[in-house]
C-alpha cells in the first residue's frame, strides 16, 4: 500500500522504507499529530483524564472559584509557575511542530514555487516566514494581556508586591507557548534537513531564547518579561519584514526605506533598557536586591550583545555594498570603453579606404 508523504516536506516519487529517516521526515507532522491525539483522547476518559490534563491544562492555580449557585460567575483563576508546567510545554511543543508543518506546506511552499528563488533566498524566505507568524501572534497576544492587566495605565504593577505576581490564564498561556516554540526549534533542525554549517546559529537562538524566558518565568519576573518580549517582537517583526523585502526586491528599489528597521531597532533597545532600569533598579530592588541586580545585569548584557551584533551586521552590509558598487562601476567603465572603441571602428569603416587609418599589420608591412 502506497504511503502518502506527510506535511512539511516536498513529496518524492518513491516511498521511503517505514521507520527510515526519510519516512520520519516526510511524515513527521502526521506522526506528531497522532501522538498529540493520544493526549486529547485520553482527556475524554475518566481513568486517564488526570494524566492527560497534566499535559493539556494549565496548573498551579492559587486563586479562583468555579461557578456555583451562590456565585454564578465564579472568580477568575490566577496561576504561578510550577513543575507541572513542563508537561504542558511538552504538549504545546508538539502543537508547534504541527503548526510549523502546516504553515510550511500550505503557505510558504506554495508562495516559493511561484517565485523561483535560489537556495539561499529560499532558506531566508522560509525562516523569516515562519518567524514572522510566531512574532506577530506573540506580539498581539502579549499586547492583549498587557492591556487587560493594565500594565500601561499603571506602570508600577510591574514591581509592586514582587515576587507575589500571580498570572491570569492568558498570561500563563503566553509563557507556555513561548517556551514551547523555542523548544520546538531543535527537532525542526532534523525535520527540515538544515545543513550542519547553518545549525549553530539556530541552536544558539533556540537555547538562549528558551533559557532567558524560563529564568524570567521561574523567578517571578513574568510581568516585566511579558512587556519586554512584546516590545522585542515588535522589532523582530520589522526586521524580518525587511528581510523578506530583500528577498522579493531583486533590483533593490526599496533599499532606501531600510532605515526604518534601524530606527525601530534603536527604539526597541532604548525602551527595553529604560523599562529594565525603572522596574529592576528602582522598583524590584527595594524588595530583593540580589535578584533584581542579577536580572538587570543579565538584561543589559543581552541588550549589549544584540547592539553589538546589529552594528557588526550593518558594517558588514556597508562593506559589501561598497564592494558591489565598485565592481559595478568597473563593469560600467569597461562597457563604456568597449562601446566607444566599437563606435570608433564603425565610424572609420564608413570612411573611404584612403581616409581610413592603417591597421598595425599593414603599417608594419610598409
Predicted regions: what they are:
Residues 231-242:
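Alpha-helical transmembrane segments and their membrane-interface exit regions
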Residues 224-227, 239-240, 275-276, 320:
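Intrinsically disordered, low-complexity regions enriched in proline, serine, glycine
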Residues 200, 223-231:
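Hydrophobic alpha-helical membrane segments of integral membrane proteins
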Residues 229-233, 262-266:
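Transmembrane helix-bundle signature of multi-pass membrane transporters/permeases
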Residues 1-220, 246-265, 271-366:
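Membrane-helix and juxtamembrane interface regions of eukaryotic multi-pass membrane proteins
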Amino acid at each position: 500500500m502506497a504511503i502518502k508523504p506527510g506535511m512539511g516536506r516536498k513529496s518524492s516519487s518513491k516511498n521511503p522504507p517505514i521507520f527510515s529517516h526519510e519516512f520520519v521526515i516526510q511524515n513527521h507532522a502526521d506522526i506528531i499529530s497522532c501522538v498529540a491525539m493520544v493526549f486529547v483522547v485520553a482527556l475524554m476518559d475518566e481513568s486517564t483524564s488526570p494524566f492527560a490534563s497534566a499535559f493539556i491544562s494549565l496548573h498551579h492555580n492559587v486563586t479562583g472559584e468555579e461557578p456555583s449557585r451562590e456565585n454564578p460567575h465564579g472568580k477568575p483563576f490566577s496561576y504561578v509557575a510550577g513543575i507541572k508546567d513542563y508537561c504542558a510545554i511538552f504538549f504545546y511543543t508538539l502543537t508547534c511542530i504541527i503548526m510549523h508543518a502546516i504553515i510550511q506546506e500550505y503557505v510558504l511552499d506554495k508562495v516559493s514555487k511561484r517565485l523561483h528563488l535560489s537556495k539561499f533566498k529560499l532558506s531566508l524566505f522560509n525562516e523569516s516566514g515562519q518567524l514572522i507568524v510566531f512574532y506577530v501572534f506573540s506580539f498581539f497576544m502579549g499586547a492583549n494581556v498587557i492591556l487587560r492587566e493594565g500594565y500601561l495605565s499603571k506602570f508600577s504593577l510591574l514591581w509592586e508586591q514582587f515576587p507575589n505576581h500571580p498570572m491570569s490564564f492568558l498570561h500563563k498561556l503566553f509563557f507556555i507557548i513561548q517556551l514551547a516554540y523555542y523548544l520546538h526549534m531543535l527537532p525542526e533542525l532534523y525535520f527540515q534537513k538544515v545543513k550542519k554549517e547553518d545549525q549553530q546559529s539556530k541552536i544558539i537562538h533556540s537555547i538562549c531564547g528558551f533559557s532567558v524566558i524560563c529564568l524570567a518565568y521561574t523567578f517571578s519576573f513574568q510581568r516585566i518579561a511579558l512587556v519586554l518580549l512584546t516590545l522585542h517582537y515588535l522589532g523582530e517583526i520589522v526586521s524580518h519584514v525587511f528581510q523578506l523585502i530583500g528577498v522579493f526586491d531583486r533590483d533593490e528599489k526599496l533599499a532606501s526605506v531600510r532605515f526604518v528597521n534601524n530606527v525601530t531597532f534603536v527604539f526597541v533597545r532604548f525602551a527595553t533598557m529604560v523599562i529594565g532600569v525603572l522596574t529592576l533598579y528602582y522598583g524590584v530592588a527595594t524588595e530583593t536586591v540580589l535578584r533584581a541586580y542579577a536580572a538587570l545585569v543579565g538584561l543589559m548584557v543581552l541588550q549589549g550583545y544584540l547592539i553589538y551584533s546589529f552594528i557588526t551586521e550593518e558594517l558588514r552590509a556597508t562593506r559589501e555594498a561598497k564592494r558591489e558598487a565598485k565592481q559595478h562601476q568597473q563593469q560600467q567603465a569597461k562597457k563604456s570603453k568597449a562601446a566607444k572603441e566599437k563606435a570608433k571602428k564603425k565610424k572609420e569603416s564608413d570612411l573611404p579606404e584612403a581616409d581610413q587609418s592603417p591597421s598595425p599589420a599593414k603599417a608594419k608591412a610598409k
